[in-house]
């Protein structure tokens, strides 16, 4: 770490849902510290946290309030939000205030001139992976249930394009409220068409309702799901309901960078958010080191200079970095098929 008396570089953390502990901040700080230990940062980095309750359970106003508070704290960059609905709100705020930010949502449309994106899943790229998995498993006819939200609708739009390209059939579709607690009626309408597979696409809260409804109906249909099933890391009590479902994750067993993180911070390496936080910390540290001017604009330019770092997310060989017109951090095979089995996430 830097030992000078210079003022610290202040980085804002914009949380858009209640945090359960300090895992994210600790993993992010570790990533920054790894860069600092190379001697390329001449001052400390201070994290300034703001909690908000964004969509879908909160409001746009909460996200805007937290952003305004961080702006007033004179941070030179922001990390967050984590949910696409809220990153879509934050991106124009970043552009207006000229504050670089790295969100860790799944939506490529959250990127902008000042908004960078570390992909914890992908609304646009997961559906082709799921459609290809259908072909691989010989499942040709899908019933699709998706969240009635920007996240769910974008997933459904991209799945429709992917299944059409591969000649797959959709037997029926149904939208579900993002915070729904009962999906029995919806599934009851989809079941008579006898699909080969149920495809769930959403933010994740409603996946619990779908799991409970499948059990109540005694419907043993194969299920493919998007990265919503990462909820299982935070909700161990939901894992049995996901048993046998295949889903998209961003952690892989063959990733050497993740294995190294596992040796140092097992809790962070144990799930996608910890790996993302560590990588975002490294990106920020490298961006600060590369900045020619310690201003918001200078940090944004520094981030665009970060290239070819090994990622802790994705399969081995996945890289992170940015560019002038490239604000997507992860490059390569960063989407990983996994399943919940005996209470554990297992790579397929």
How does the language model describe each region?
Residues 1-348:
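Extracytosolic ligand-binding ectodomains
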């Amino acid at each position: 770490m830097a030992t000078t008396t210079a003022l610290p570089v202040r980085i804002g953390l914009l949380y858009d849902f209640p945090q359960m502990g300090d895992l994210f901040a600790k993993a992010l700080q570790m990533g920054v510290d790894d860069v600092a230990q190379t001697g390329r940062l001449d001052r400390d980095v201070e994290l300034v946290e703001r909690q908000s309750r964004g969509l879908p359970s909160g409001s746009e106003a909460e996200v805007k309030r937290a952003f305004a508070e961080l702006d007033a704290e004179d941070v030179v960059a922001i990390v967050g939000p984590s949910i696409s609905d809220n990153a879509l709100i934050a991106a124009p705020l970043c552009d207006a205030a000229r504050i670089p930010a790295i969100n860790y949502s799944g939506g490529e449309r959250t990127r902008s001139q000042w908004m960078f994106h570390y992909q914890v899943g992908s609304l646009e790229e997961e559906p082709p992976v799921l459609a290809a998995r259908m072909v691989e498993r010989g499942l040709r006819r899908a019933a699709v249930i998706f969240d009635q939200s920007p996240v769910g609708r974008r997933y459904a739009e991209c799945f429709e394009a992917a299944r059409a390209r591969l000649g797959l059939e959709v037997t029926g579709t149904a939208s579900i409220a993002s915070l729904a607690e009962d999906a029995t009626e919806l599934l009851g309408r989809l079941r008579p068409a006898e699909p080969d597979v149920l495809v769930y696409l959403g933010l994740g809260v409603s996946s619990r309702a779908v799991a409970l409804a499948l059990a109540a109906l005694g419907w043993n249909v194969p299920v493919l799901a998007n990265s919503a099933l990462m909820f299982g890391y935070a909700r161990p009590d939901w894992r049995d309901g996901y048993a046998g479902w295949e889903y998209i994750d961003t952690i892989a067993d063959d990733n050497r960078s993740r294995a190294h993180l596992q040796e140092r911070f097992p809790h962070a390496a144990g799930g996608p958010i910890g790996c993302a936080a560590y990588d975002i910390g490294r990106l920020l540290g490298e961006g600060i080191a590369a900045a020619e001017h310690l201003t918001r604009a200078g940090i944004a330019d520094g981030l665009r200079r970060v290239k070819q770092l090994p990622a802790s997310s994705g399969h081995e060989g996945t890289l992170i970095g940015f560019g002038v017109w490239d604000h997507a951090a992860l490059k390569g095979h960063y989407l990983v098929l996994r399943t919940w089995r005996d209470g554990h996430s297992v790579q397929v």
